[in-house]
Amino acid sequence: MMSGEKKELVFKKIGIAIAFSPRLEALIAEAAKMQVGLKSEMIFIHVGNKSEEDVKTINEYLEKYNLLNNSKLIWQEGETVETILNICNEEQLDLLVAGALEKESLIKYIMGSVARKLSRKVKCSMLMLTEPKIESSPLKSIVVEGSNNPKTENTIAVAIEIAKAFKVKNVDVIQETDLNKAVLIRSDEFKENEVAKHKENLIEEEDKRLNYILSCNDCGDIKINIDRIEGKPGYIISKYAREHHADLLILNSPDRKLNLIDRVFPTDIEFALADLPCNLLLVNIKEDYTA
């Protein structure tokens, strides 16, 4: 049951995982935009050997984007994924940001890239940027999951907060409804002529749930569009985001830690991770880092 209680939505502490790649400056530029929009504390994380020249390079970019004196740089050696996860825990991050390729080779996807490994293990929310940009590029379109899940209330609230912070005018809330599957599971309870009515009842329940969630949020001038799409959850919302040229897709974080089997036999979230349609935000209700 949804409580209707307002949760703390602001990403107060954001970690940016950076590496010496062609995307370095673009990731720092994106961090600067986030700091302006969300008023967050920014922590840059680099795993690798430390040299004066490398420190100078990063500091020059931080200064260029007015982040040198109001951000923190953590530089550690170790295995990349585990080191970043440990820093997330130590710093009690609300959001981790990393660059990610839209699509990877099958072998690399199954074995796991750094960004995708982090997304499956991190306790906080995670933003995967497919095309970080140096130049200012307005956020125009957000697609957010509206599934029947205890996390969805918080996820939609976060989507609305981000839309307000970056002056996004349109937010699409997508109900991925596998109605045939839902009816099949309970088909023994209904006669053949009752199946259609049961589908209607399921749709009505979903509409009431989403309307309740939206009524608990101050949407301001944002236009909320609710669409119901019947199909495989995870896959169908990614397809929708791509076809509608969304700038940001926002999903609930996985309900459990994902493993190799989930990549070979994809779960809902793995459909999105396999072929990112745009920037992807996985919203997690922040866990106790001491657990």
Question: What do the PLM-derived regions correspond to, one by one?
Answer:
Residues 54-62, 203-211:
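N-terminal membrane-insertion helices
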Residues 1-2, 85-135, 240-291:
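Gly/Ser-rich helix-loop-strand patches that form or flank binding pockets
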Residues 24, 77-78, 108, 152, ...:
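A conditional alpha-helix N-cap/helix-loop micro-motif detector
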Residues 193-205:
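A short acidic, glycine-rich active-site loop
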Residues 1-9, 33, 50, 60-96, ...:
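Structural beta-alpha unit
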Residues 19, 50, 76, 102, ...:
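Structured loop/turn residues at secondary-structure junctions
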Residues 43-45, 72-76, 127, 172-174, ...:
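General small-molecule cofactor/ligand-binding pocket signal
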Residues 2-57, 64, 69, 141-193, ...:
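Small/aliphatic-rich secondary-structure junction motif
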